[in-house]
Amino acid sequence: MDKKEYFAHETAVIDEGCSIGKGTKIWHFSHIMPNSVIGENCNIGQNVVISPEVVLGRNVKVQNNVSIYTGVICEDDVFLGPSMVFTNIINPRSAVVRKGEYVRTLVKRGASIGANATVVCGNDIGEFAFIGAGAVVTKEVLPYALVIGNPARQAGWMSEYGHKLNFNENGIAVCPESGEKYKLENNRVRKIK
């Protein structure tokens, strides 16, 4: 761990045994715990806790007041909105030790999770999925899916640029920002050339 390759605010706590990528920024009052892995060019906001053995890919943006618990893996280009929550135990009890029962949650490349959303552990988030603010995710989210509400329900599909996709009668949609085309078949979206 070479401090010259990343920035950590003087109030941030970086435990021994972390791997932090070049160009990453860690802001005020954040705590990076042992054996966590943070990729290159990540931004870790204020008051963030990254627990042991968490893995963040490259260019992950973690906004203020997020706790990322053991068992969470975020692939490249993931966005975690302010005060969103991951759980890592299915049935927590204060008097029952469950440290060996952490449940894995995988957030795939390009997914965005909105402010104050909750992701119940064990529910993977697909590539470029978009979790609306305040949503409570209690089941797997498909790639490119837009989910909202409590419990979260699918409300459409999103482009890789974060725009809602409107599919025509042939199952084709165009992102208004990038011009990229998408195909909807069998309740799955894929980008086409």
Feature-to-residue mapping (PLM):
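Short, non-ligating residues that shape and space the ligands of small metal-coordination modules
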Residues: 167-168, 181-186
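Short, intrinsically disordered, charge-biased short linear motifs at domain edges
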Residues: 143-149, 158-167
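Flexible, glycine/small-residue-enriched loop-and-beta-strand segment within the central core
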Residues: 2-10, 16-18, 25-125, 156-158
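Cys/His-enriched microdomains
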Residues: 154-157, 173
